[in-house]
């Protein structure tokens, strides 16, 4: 069996981890990932190394029983333990999560996004189409079920464990990139009820009730996330995350206090993982 079989087995690993049409089973997911790696599928081999916190050279890749050895080194109980969550602000509700992603996971996600990012888009409130707009000048890459992996699935699971926001409510995650001068000007993440372009999305997919941003690197300057109505901004360390509710806790209505911006980067290149969460289970895409 070759790469084709390995790719199919790796897809089964993702489905097992995410609980698609079955209960989530991370032990089975790791076992399937090992099988995929043994079939020669490089992405599965890389994911095992990331989950085990190992660096592989040519000699290591040639070793007998390497992939099972790596799997035994994965601290699955630790990875499936909720990361610490600390409240940073009450209105709007903002929390900081320590170590949502490991350093190896951050590097993997940057590499995964680097070859795929394209100009970021915003939703047009009149048409519902996603369009390029000067309000957002960075780049983004989305990863639906067809091209997600166990590293992305683990960030979603760890967010669920910390916050109670179920994996199946989470949209496809996006890796974001901002180079010098690029920014995301003041905006809201919620969908405005009654707007013709958004109402169908609200009716079918629900409101975007929460946003989680995970910092993937720190070799840049500027680029803080600023909440303009409360005069508060934040920038996390690699692997740390910020979770905020886009709706009021009292009545679940859109919260105008969440007006926020990604400030311009002044040196280097900023990488983030963005995760939006809806108020209901999402279609499988």
Predicted regions and their residues:
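A conserved position within tetratricopeptide repeats
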Residues: 1-2, 37
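Fe(II)/2-oxoglutarate oxygenase catalytic core
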Residues: 11-18, 24-243, 247-285
């Amino acid at each position: 069996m070759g790469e084709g079989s390995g790719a199919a087995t790796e897809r089964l690993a993702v489905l097992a981890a995410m609980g698609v049409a079955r209960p989530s089973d991370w032990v089975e997911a790791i076992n399937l990932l090992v099988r995929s790696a043994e079939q020669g599928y490089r992405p599965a081999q890389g994911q095992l190394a990331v989950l085990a916190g190992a660096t592989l050279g040519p000699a290591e890749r040639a070793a007998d029983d390497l992939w099972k050895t790596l799997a035994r080194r994965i601290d699955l109980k630790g990875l499936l333990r909720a990361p610490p969550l600390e409240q940073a602000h009450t209105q709007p509700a903002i929390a900081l999560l320590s170590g949502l992603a490991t350093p190896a996971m951050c590097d993997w996600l940057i590499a995964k996004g680097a070859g795929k990012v394209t100009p970021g888009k915003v939703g047009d409130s009149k048409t519902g189409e996603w369009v390029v707009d000067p309000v957002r000048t960075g780049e983004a890459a989305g990863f639906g079920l067809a091209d997600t992996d166990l590293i992305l699935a683990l960030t979603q699971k760890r967010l669920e464990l910390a916050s109670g926001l179920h994996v199946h409510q989470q949209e496809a995650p996006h890796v974001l990139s901002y180079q010098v001068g690029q920014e995301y000007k003041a905006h809201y993440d919620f969908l405005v009820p009654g707007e013709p372009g958004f109402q169908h999305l609200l009716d079918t997919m629900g409101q975007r009730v929460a946003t989680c941003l995970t910092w993937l690197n720190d070799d840049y300057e500027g680029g803080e996330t600023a909440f303009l109505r409360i005069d508060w901004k934040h920038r996390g360390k690699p692997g740390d995350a910020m979770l905020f509710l886009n709706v009021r806790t009292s009545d679940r209505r859109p919260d105008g206090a969440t007006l926020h911006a990604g400030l311009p980067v002044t040196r280097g290149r900023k990488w983030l993982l963005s995760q939006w969460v809806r108020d209901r289970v999402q279609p499988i895409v």
